[in-house]
């Protein structure tokens, strides 16, 4: 019930921002202009008689410390906001702070009867008590919206979630701080009064002005080119914000309610006592109370006079008593202004602190240090510092001159001398390149061990290039194949042998792709023109409604082949392995080989006296072929104990099936089985894809379904899924050869909506063989692309989730590519686009000169 009330309040503020803002500003102006007289505060709130002797050095030290803490706390909060990486959150929080300060100042001056000089302490208490965390959470709720219409709903949802907690916290804080106003200590009473006013102002502004202003700012933001709001396109991508994290602890809430009830009784007793005294009919008793408790004269909270200096008295009328003034109003104003501008020791301390923080922020806080990861609904944010580099080299040119790393001496040493040096503690690193080449040529050093022998991977690669150039007479063939400034330590023993360089492949980016409520920019490593542009167009068409994806199966496979003496033993072994208890024993042995590999089932086929056993297991975030091989080997050893006459012919019997087209992968699945769907509105098909629903359906049926069936295709019921799969595989360090099975895809299209003018499109990919750890994913460029997608490495909280997310991204990107290419075919734009984007600048004879893109 309470949540619904707060939701309705939030919906009203977000739906009527102008009305709420104008009403709030009007009330603020009224506080500044209507009835300037101070309120008659209850006893204990500031009417106790004080003497100037109370303001000593200890008071100044305490207040200076409070001011410093307030400044540092405010600096910490805004630095924390800047780490979120969103200029919108930072600006909105700043606006919230400024407006709250303005309302607070108005409240202090009017309702508490304070003068302007009190603000220098009141504002510091306001800064000390303001909490921007809830304001930030509400801003994140709003910024997580994927459209302008969703902003109001998300603001209402945020108010419904945060409102009850903030209301209870405000009540508790006000009552707890209000206890200080019962102390009878003048200074503590005034400070507590400021604090209570700060808490109340923060609450009122947060519940009224802030959500309305938040809605208005985002409503006035211009839309990006992709049709998304500008603040949604330009903000860093943020991870999902779970609502459970914002729900209060019910036990803590009950304790707060009980505490509030008790404190209310204390304050009620005090107010009843004060009211009874105020209504006391006996004037003598009233005077006795005033003499011992309070006086009718109210002084300012802070003394501007030093010891021994008299303050000009102010004429105050309180009841029947009159205090004469011995100075004019102009003299008083001039006096207080001069005292305000006087630089005292506490002012100097605050000024030094502010200057130090400013210098630290400007000169010592780099942008990289302020980048972190934050979670929000459907966004992803990259947390690692960004350092822009050339392609694995520090120089703009990636060509490597073909010359030795060291100049050889005038006369080379003999083979025996070189061997002696090589076997010594100094090692081959003390030899020149020519001497190492001589040892390789003579067979004393294996060519594949050059990096290890010379103890410098880059030098070893350079020497191997020289040997290859000389023995194969390549001349300058390797000049444009770079090899310098690459981290070969991650390559050795993991990715490649006999390395002679690395191959720079252009990496384009398509996106953002609206996948399951997230915006993802997808890297595509390809040398095919039009591919990135076409995929990007498909993503733009899918932006409004987004793509929905699901993982329907997960299991990497390894299919060994074993042989028995006869079919009787083969069939008996097959039936034995299918018994649940025996399978559990096989699974126990299989699972013992890895922390992540878990055998889920086995699929057995008999061919004569041969058994083809397909082990299917989940492998966490790894692609898992090595895990499967190791587990399969141990599991077969256990089966062999029961059937000693079983002969293991091969650990892979092509029943996996790996890197070959196979119906078993298409039917049973391998790796991640993913399904994606999307709805494309009719106006998008016409404006972005330049075609119609009927034309798309006709081309899809005749090309992808009938044409593939005529060709006898297995899993090839698509337009060009392999294009996108391979491009993502190369960019993210997957095994490119596995695009054979991973590209199995069926693309389906059908009319959608009441009038059938919209398009429903889906892609089913049953065998995406993919992982985020191991293999080429450890290489820095490939790891950077995984980082870009937010799936680098293993997922510690939920093993396998990163690999599943990457598989979903692949399928969603394939859907975008399919949609764009099919539209080009339906509209007859395929040849035209390839002639423009996929041709060299040199025109063929008889063709028209190409038109520059900037003039098209």
From Swiss-Prot:
Residues 365-443 are annotated as: Linker. CDD domains: HMG-CoA_reductase_classI. It is found in: Endoplasmic reticulum membrane. GO terms for biological process: coenzyme A metabolic process; isoprenoid biosynthetic process; sterol biosynthetic process. InterPro entries: HMG_CoA_Rdtase, HMG_CoA_Rdtase_cat_sf, HMG_CoA_Rdtase_CS, HMG_CoA_Rdtase_eu_arc, HMG_CoA_Rdtase_metazoan, HMG_CoA_Rdtase_N, HMG_CoA_Rdtase_NAD(P)-bd_sf, HMG_CoA_Rdtase_sub-bd_dom_sf. One of its GO terms (molecular function) is NADP binding. It holds the Pfam family Sterol-sensing. Its EC number is 1.1.1.34. Glycans are attached at residues 326, 412, 700, 838. Residues 836-856 are annotated as: Disordered. Residues 840-856 have a biased composition (Low complexity). The chain crosses the membrane at residues 12-32, 89-109, 123-143, 190-210, 344-364. Residues 443-771 are annotated as: Catalytic. It catalyses: (R)-mevalonate + 2 NADP(+) + CoA = (3S)-3-hydroxy-3-methylglutaryl-CoA + 2 NADPH + 2 H(+). This is 3-hydroxy-3-methylglutaryl-coenzyme A reductase. It comes from Blattella germanica.
């Amino acid at each position: 019930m309470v949540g619904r009330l707060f939701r309705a309040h939030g919906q009203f503020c977000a739906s009527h921002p102008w009305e709420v803002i104008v009403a709030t500003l009007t009330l603020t102006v009224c506080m500044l202009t209507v009835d300037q007289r101070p309120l008659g505060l209850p006893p204990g709130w500031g009417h106790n008689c004080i003497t100037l002797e109370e303001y000593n050095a200890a008071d100044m030290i305490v207040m200076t410390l409070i001011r410093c803490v307030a400044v540092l706390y405010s600096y910490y909060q805004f630095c924390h906001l800047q780490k979120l990486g969103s200029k919108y959150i930072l600006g909105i929080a700043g606006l919230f702070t400024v407006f709250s300060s303005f309302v607070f100042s108005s409240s202090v001056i009017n309702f508490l009867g304070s003068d302007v000089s009190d603000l220098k302490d009141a504002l510091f208490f306001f800064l000390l008590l303001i909490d921007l965390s809830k304001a930030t959470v509400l801003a994140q709720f709003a910024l997580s919206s994927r459209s302008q219409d969703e902003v109001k709903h998300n603001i209402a949802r945020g108010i419904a979630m945060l409102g009850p907690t903030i209301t209870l916290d405000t009540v508790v804080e006000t009552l707890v701080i209000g206890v200080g106003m019962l102390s009878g200590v003048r200074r503590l009473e005034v400070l507590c009064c400021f604090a209570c006013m700060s808490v109340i102002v923060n609450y009122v502004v947060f519940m009224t002005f802030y959500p309305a202003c938040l809605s208005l700012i985002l409503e006035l933001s211009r839309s990006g080119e992709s049709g998304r709001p500008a603040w949604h396109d330009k903000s860093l991508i943020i991870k999902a914000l779970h609502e459970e994290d914002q729900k209060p602890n019910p036990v803590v809430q009950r304790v707060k309610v009980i505490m509030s009830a008790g404190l209310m009784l204390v304050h009620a007793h005090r107010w009843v006592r004060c009211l009874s005294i105020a209504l006391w009919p006996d004037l003598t008793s009233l005077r006795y109370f005033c003499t011992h408790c309070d006086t009718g004269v109210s002084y300012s909270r802070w003394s501007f006079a030093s010891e021994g200096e008299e303050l000009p008295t102010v004429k105050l009328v309180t009841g029947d008593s009159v205090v004469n003034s011995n100075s004019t109003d102009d003299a008083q104003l001039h006096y207080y202004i001069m005292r305000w501008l006087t630089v005292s020791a506490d002012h100097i301390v605050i000024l030094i602190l502010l200057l130090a923080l400013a210098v630290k922020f400007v000169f010592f806080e780099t942008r990289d240090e302020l980048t972190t990861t934050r979670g929000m609904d459907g966004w992803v944010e990259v947390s690692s510092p960004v350092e822009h580099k050339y392609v694995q080299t520090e120089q703009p040119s990636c060509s490597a001159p073909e010359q030795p790393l060291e100049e050889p001496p005038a006369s080379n040493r003999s083979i025996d001398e070189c061997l002696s040096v090589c076997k010594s503690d100094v090692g081959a690193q003390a030899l020149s390149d020519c001497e190492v080449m001589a040892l390789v040529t003579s067979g004393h050093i294996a060519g594949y061990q050059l990096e290890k022998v010379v103890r410098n991977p880059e030098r070893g690669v350079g020497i191997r290039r020289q040997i290859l150039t000389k023995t194969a007479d390549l001349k300058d063939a390797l000049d444009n194949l770079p090899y310098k400034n690459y981290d070969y330590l991650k390559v050795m023993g993991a990715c490649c042998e006999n390395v002679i360089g690395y191959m720079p492949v252009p990496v384009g980016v398509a996106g953002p792709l609206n996948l399951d409520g997230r915006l993802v920019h997808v890297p595509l490593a390809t040398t095919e023109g039009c591919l990135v542009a076409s995929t990007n167009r498909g993503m733009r068409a899918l932006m409004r409604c987004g793509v929905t994806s699901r993982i329907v199966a997960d299991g990497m496979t390894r299919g060994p082949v074993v042989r028995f003496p006869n079919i009787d033993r083969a069939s008996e072994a097959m039936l034995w392995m299918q018994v649940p208890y025996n399978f559990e024993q096989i699974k126990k042995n299989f699972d013992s080989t890895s922390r992540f590999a878990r055998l889920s089932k086995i699929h057995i086929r008999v061919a004569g006296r041969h058994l083809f056993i397909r082990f299917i297991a989940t492998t966490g975030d790894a692609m898992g072929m090595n895990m499967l091989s190791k587990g399969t080997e141990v599991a077969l050893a256990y089966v062999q104990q029961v059937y000693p006459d079983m002969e293991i012919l091969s650990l892979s019997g092509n029943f996996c099936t790996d890197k070959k087209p196979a119906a078993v992968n298409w039917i049973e699945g391998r790796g991640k089985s993913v399904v994606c769907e999307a709805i494309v509105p009719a106006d998008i098909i016409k404006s972005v894809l330049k075609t119609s629903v009927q034309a798309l359906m006709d081309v899809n049926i005749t090309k992808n379904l009938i044409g593939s069936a005529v060709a006898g295709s297995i899993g090839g019921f698509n337009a060009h899924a392999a294009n996108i799969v391979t491009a993502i595989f190369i960019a993210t360090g997957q095994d490119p050869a596995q695009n054979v099975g991973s590209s199995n895809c069926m693309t389906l299209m059908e009319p959608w909506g009441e009038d059938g003018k919209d398009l429903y499109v889906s892609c089913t990919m049953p065998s995406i063989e993919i992982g985020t750890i191991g293999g080429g994913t450890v290489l820095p460029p490939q790891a950077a692309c995984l980082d870009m997608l937010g799936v680098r490495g293993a997922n510690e909280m939920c093993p396998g989730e990163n690999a599943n997310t990457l598989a979903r991204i692949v399928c969603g990107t394939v859907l975008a590519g399919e949609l764009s290419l099919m539209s080009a075919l339906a509209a007859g734009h395929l040849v035209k686009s390839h002639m423009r984007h996929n041709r060299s600048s040199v025109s063929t004879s008889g063709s028209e000169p190409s038109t520059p893109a900037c003039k098209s």
